[in-house]
Amino acid sequence: MIEEQKPNNSTETAISPMQCYVQPFFRLLHKDCFLAIREIESNSIDLIVTDPPYGINLSKGYKSGSEELVKGDDGFTIMVFVDELMQEFSRILKLNSAIYVFTRFDVYPYWWLKMKNYFETKNQIIWSKGGGGVGDLQGNYIHNYESIIYATNGKHKLRNKREGSVWQIPKCKLEFHETEKPVELIEKIIVKSSDEGMVVFDPFMGGGTTGIACKNLNRSFVGIEMIETNFITAKSRIENHCPQIRVFP
């Protein structure tokens, strides 16, 4: 079941991710994250996986307030609301559950410190994605990894076998979003920190990859996306995706 909620819906009700644990549900909201997240019931989310926007100038390889940024990726706006965002995350996340936030080397320390005020920050996971990069090709080393902050709300138990914090997963072709992540990477996070039927939340849904991973793994999904083109893409992908059975050690 996929439920869509648009910005000017006069019949809005509180989001209740406790609806069904046998057959997963999918609720997609085309709204501003900071407005939509307030509708989510407290202690109703089992896992948060998200890649918040941050500013980057692709032509020069550094942040700039005057240059054109990646569409929908205004890091200077998002930083103002990090405290508010973390406060809401801590409200909706169940006790003994986990949160994973993608970030980058230059904004990682800021996010880590902010998250530490609300969660128990556990690890910096390094996603080694391989390949080349963009920006200053002569003056910079190739940027071939991303940081993921893993934190918990209480004593969270990881599933399956214990493993290291460097994950070597090839990056995917950018078909649906400017900062698209491989489905395999999101699936790995979901399998390590949730069980079938649990509710996964992504407030910056982008092209819908987290929803695709949830569909493959029999998890319920609540996703928010403000940019209309991204929302349409994500909704279409999730609706038309045929789940693929995955086996994880």
Task: Locate the predicted segments by residue.
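Short, conserved SAM-binding/catalytic segment
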Residues: 14-23, 235-249
